[in-house]
């Protein structure tokens, strides 16, 4: 995939901006706070239909405005397509999605139209944030290419919310929960099986990636840890934990309690891992998603690299450059282009460099 054009209106710090991209490697260069990451965020919005930094659409609107608009022209499989995302906060909250000028009603209809892989310092949350962040990582990855999975996940969360609301009322008749239990199990088992499949597939790329990054020194396993192993155990645990759930006022078992273990000798990486090991692990994970898109799904995603190269040591930088060499289009943000020139200089492709200062963008090369 290749992003050829990007338009922003009233998005974050940008009132109006239109950029054309004709190179494989694009650099946004500027000091912190100048709006570099806002551009990657806009690209992510076209891909994920949500921000990687902000949960509320209204907070993405430029100060003093009531709406934002994004448009991207994407080339893939010899065809060009146009994605549009718009959001209005006043007088009524409304979001509008378009694909090739036609309005799209369901978010799931846009899945797979524009795929990106983002690498950012915030990725360390996957390692340090515990089970919730690791589930979020796996769910976001699967949802990026599997609309049925996303629909199951959204439905599961709705059912879980209904069941928890009933539990909080302190109902005495378990039959009132039975319909929600059946639905929870039905959707939960579908999610469980897909997570198992994808984690197994990612592992085949994650382990070699980690070996390259660490020189074979870090033997850190990635193991899917389901809260329930199958449908029968889900049924049994829900029944056995009913009393506990009534006391707690929420559902204590299910796929919403799953974990993705990363560590060694049954010890999680958060208990012993150095910052270098954590960085290697998260890069190996993110690179594994890129490998999966490319080798399993036969899709070349666009790489978005948010000021992470300078944080890496020599060996990790060399691996990073190898990843970019084997990628398609890649967007970088950096405060210091000269500081990473020794590494990106090895990339012989034509580059586009945009200098960002006080909200203004100047094409430098």
UniProtKB/Swiss-Prot annotation:
Example GO biological process: double-strand break repair
Keyword Cytoplasm: yes
Record-listed ATP binding positions: 30-37
Pfam families recorded: SMC_N
Keyword Signal: no
Molecular function via GO: ATP binding; single-stranded DNA binding
Gene Ontology CC: cytoplasm
Subcellular location: Cytoplasm
Signal peptide: none
InterPro entries: DNA-binding_RecF, DNA-binding_RecF_CS, P-loop_NTPase, RecF/RecN/SMC_N, RecF_2
The entry's keywords: ATP-binding, Cytoplasm, DNA damage, DNA repair, DNA replication, DNA-binding, Nucleotide-binding, SOS response
Coarse class of the protein's main subcellular location: cytoplasm
Function description: The RecF protein is involved in DNA metabolism; it is required for DNA replication and normal SOS inducibility. RecF binds preferentially to single-stranded, linear DNA. It also seems to bind ATP.
Family: Belongs to the RecF family.
Name recorded for this polypeptide: DNA replication and repair protein RecF
Gene (name only): recF
């Amino acid at each position: 995939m290749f992003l050829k054009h990007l338009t922003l209106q009233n998005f974050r710090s940008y009132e109006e901006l239109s950029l054309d991209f004709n190179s494989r490697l694009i650099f946004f260069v500027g000091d912190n706070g100048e709006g570099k990451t806002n551009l990657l965020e806009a690209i992510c919005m076209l891909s994920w239909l949500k921000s990687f930094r902000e949960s509320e659409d209204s907070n993405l609107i430029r100060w003093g405005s009531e709406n934002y608009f994004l448009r991207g022209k994407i080339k893939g499989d010899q065809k060009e397509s146009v994605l549009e995302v718009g959001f209005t906060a006043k007088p009524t909250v409304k979001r509008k999605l378009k694909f090739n000028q036609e309005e799209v009603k369901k978010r799931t209809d846009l899945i797979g139209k524009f795929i990106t892989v983002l690498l950012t310092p915030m990725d360390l949350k996957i390692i340090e944030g515990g089970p919730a962040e690791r589930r979020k990582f796996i769910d976001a990855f699967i949802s990026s290419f599997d609309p049925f999975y996303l629909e199951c996940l959204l439905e599961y969360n709705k059912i879980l919310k209904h069941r928890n609301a009933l539990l909080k009322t302190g109902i005495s008749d378990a039959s009132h929960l039975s319909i929600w239990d059946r639905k929870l199990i039905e959707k939960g088992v579908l999610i469980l099986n897909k997570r198992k499949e994808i984690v197994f597939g990612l592992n085949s790329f994650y382990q070699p990636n980690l070996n390259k990054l660490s020189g074979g020194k870090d033997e850190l396993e990635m193991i899917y840890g389901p809260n329930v192993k199958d449908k029968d155990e889900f049924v049994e645990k829900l029944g056995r934990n009913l009393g506990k759930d009534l006391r707690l006022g929420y559902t204590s078992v299910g796929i919403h309690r799953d974990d993705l273990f990363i560590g060694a000798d049954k010890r999680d990486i958060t208990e012993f891992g150095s910052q270098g090991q954590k960085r290697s692990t998260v890069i190996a994970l993110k690179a594994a998603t890129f490998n999966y898109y490319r080798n399993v799904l036969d899709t070349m995603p666009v790489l978005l690299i948010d000021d992470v190269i300078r944080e890496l040591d020599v060996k990790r930088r060399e691996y990073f450059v190898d990843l970019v060499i084997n990628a398609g289009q890649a967007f970088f943000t950096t405060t210091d282009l000269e500081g990473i020139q020794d590494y990106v200089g090895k990339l012989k492709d034509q580059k586009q460099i945009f200098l960002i200062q006080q909200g203004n963008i100047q094409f430098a090369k």
